[in-house]
């Protein structure tokens, strides 16, 4: 080996970080990270979460490192949808480089740069505060099929679905329902049948239209935790009705907890192999499931969704929930609802935990003439 080539090889072996830093990008990250939206010092921005303990202000970190020759100028978005859209267009390598610089320089130990904060010192918001669209998958776990029916009826319904899975059933959840971890779930005034559903949220990373299931993962950015809060009290009697009113049931303010972070897909793995999700109210575990209970895979749901609409970066698809919801009787033998004062904890392994308290909303102002939110549960006789 010529002396000059040998010397260059030795430098690359001894100083691999310097090699990637020359371009201000990296092919791999020395540590996994999560991304989220945070309020730090009165400013809302995106950050990378390291070790579930530190938040790196990516905008400030990028600005600081660009002052060195190793990091050429490259914009860092402060909005999560912009970050997702640019992630595979070079931004991923820059974030990797920022993380690698912090880890290899041991900057997380002892005195840390100003752009690194402890997670407990910042306010964690919903990672995508206002998604462009949220699609949810109805009854996509076998344990959730007819779970409020008698056992024999439920068994027949499950067998029929296994014999003919059909296609996924998708519906749109109001983007205005989104809240971040720690925010309050508000029970509409007079309503008494509030329910819970923990779900995996798949965050789209690339435009997708007519995507086949085997290619679906290529269009995914990452994964998050969702709770589909549901008002099972029904709609006002009379007038037009086509059955369940999912706008009342699922679309009200605070009915869409999401977060606390998004885990990029390279750090999560295949959800059909690793998904484990639980939901606890107080100290009582109400739901627990893994992907083996799913009817349609995450990839099949993306295929179906992309056959109906064009998916864009930052769109979210809920994978459905398992048995154990409040309206069901298969797990506990009787129905059970959220009440003011309850604390909901929803966890998906490798992503994180959502924590929310439930509070009752005050009565609406007099003279509004509003039937929504209704002041009674319509599936039961009016209470005097």
Regions found by a protein language model. Name each.
Residues 163-166, 170-173, 216-242, 253, ...:
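Flexible glycine-rich active-site/ligand-binding loops centered on an Asp-His dyad
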Residues 24-26, 36, 123-126, 158-161, ...:
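A generic local secondary-structure boundary/capping motif
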Residues 23-30, 144, 232-384:
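Catalytic-pocket segment enriched in acidic/His residues
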Residues 7-18:
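Bacterial N-terminal signal peptides
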Residues 140, 173-234:
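Non-heme Fe(II) oxygenase catalytic core, chiefly the N-lobe of the double-stranded beta-helix
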Residues 22-164, 168, 343, 365, ...:
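N-terminal non-catalytic cap/leader segment that marks the start of a structured domain
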Residues 1-4:
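Positively charged n-region of N-terminal signal peptides that target proteins for export
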């Amino acid at each position: 080996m010529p002396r000059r080539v040998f010397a260059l090889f030795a430098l690359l072996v001894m100083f691999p970080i310097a090699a990637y830093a020359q371009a201000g990008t990296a092919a791999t990250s020395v540590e996994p990270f999560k991304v989220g939206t945070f309020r730090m010092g009165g400013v809302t921005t995106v950050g990378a979460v390291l070790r579930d303990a530190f938040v790196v202000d990516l905008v400030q970190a990028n600005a600081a490192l660009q002052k060195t020759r190793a990091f050429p100028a490259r914009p860092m978005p402060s909005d999560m949808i912009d970050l997702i859209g640019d992630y595979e267009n070079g931004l991923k390598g820059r974030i990797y480089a920022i993380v690698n610089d912090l880890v290899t320089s041991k900057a997380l130990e002892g005195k840390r740069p100003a752009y690194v904060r402890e997670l407990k010192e910042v306010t964690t918001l919903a990672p995508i505060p206002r998604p462009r669209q949220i699609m949810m998958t109805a009854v996509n776990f076998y344990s959730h099929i007819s779970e409020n029916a008698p056992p024999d009826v439920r068994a027949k319904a499950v067998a029929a679905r296994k014999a003919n899975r059909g296609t996924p059933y998708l519906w749109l959840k109001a983007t205005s329902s989104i809240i971040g971890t720690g925010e309050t779930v508000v029970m509409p005034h007079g309503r008494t049948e509030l329910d819970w559903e923990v779900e995996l949220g798949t965050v789209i990373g690339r435009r997708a239209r007519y995507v086949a299931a085997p290619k679906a993962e290529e269009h995914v950015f990452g994964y998050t935790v969702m709770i589909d809060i549901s008002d099972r009290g029904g709609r006002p009697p009379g007038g037009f009705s086509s059955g369940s009113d999912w706008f009342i049931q699922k679309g009200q303010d605070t009915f869409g907890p999401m977060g606390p972070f998004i885990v990029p897909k390279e750090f999560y793995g295949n959800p059909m192999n690793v998904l484990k999700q639980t939901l606890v109210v107080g100290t009582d575990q109400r739901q627990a499931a893994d992907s083996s209970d799913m009817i349609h895979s995450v990839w099949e749901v993306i295929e179906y969704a992309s056959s109906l609409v064009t998916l864009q970066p930052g769109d979210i698809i809920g994978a459905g929930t398992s048995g154990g919801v409040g309206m069901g009787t298969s797990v506990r033998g009787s129905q059970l609802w959220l009440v003011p004062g309850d604390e909901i904890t929803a966890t998906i392994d490798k992503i994180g935990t959502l924590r929310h308290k439930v509070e009752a909303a005050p009565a609406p102002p007099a003279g509004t003439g509003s039937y929504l939110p209704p002041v009674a549960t319509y599936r039961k006789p009016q209470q005097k």
